[in-house]
Amino acid sequence: MMDWKRSFADTKVRDVYDLIVKEPSKVQRSAKIMDVIDQMLMNPTSRKVYVIDVEGNLIGVVNTEMILRLIGYRVGVKENSSMAFVHFLKDTLKEDVEDIMILKVRPVKRETPLTEALKSMIEFHVNDLPVVDDDHKLIGELMSSELFIAAKRLFESP
């Protein structure tokens, strides 16, 4: 009988990271928010658009939560508080990706153990991780769904 717990522990990011998302959504640093929305619409399984420089190096990320918040501000869906109004003033006029991208990105590499990627997802409350090569160029995206595929046998009845 196969030891699935051991099998999962031996799995690397390279074994699963492209099962669902074949090509990560990405834009250049100079892109507009509209470009991010277009990328999200073209790749609806992904919840992020990665920001890269001209060499393809990962420099940031824009997630769906940020875009939804900006949409909410533009259509008037907001909380009734002074902090919400401050956020509204701060965010509503933004048009450039550089203004909204998150700089703290925690990438993994193809050789990263899947257990390490899982630990990062849990610790940093993220569902997806960018996959980069040794030169920090974006080559893929590891989605939580891909971890589910690899771990599903852990929950099967004996």
Predicted regions and their residues:
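Tandem CBS (Cystathionine beta-synthase) repeat/Bateman regulatory domains
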Residues: M1-P158
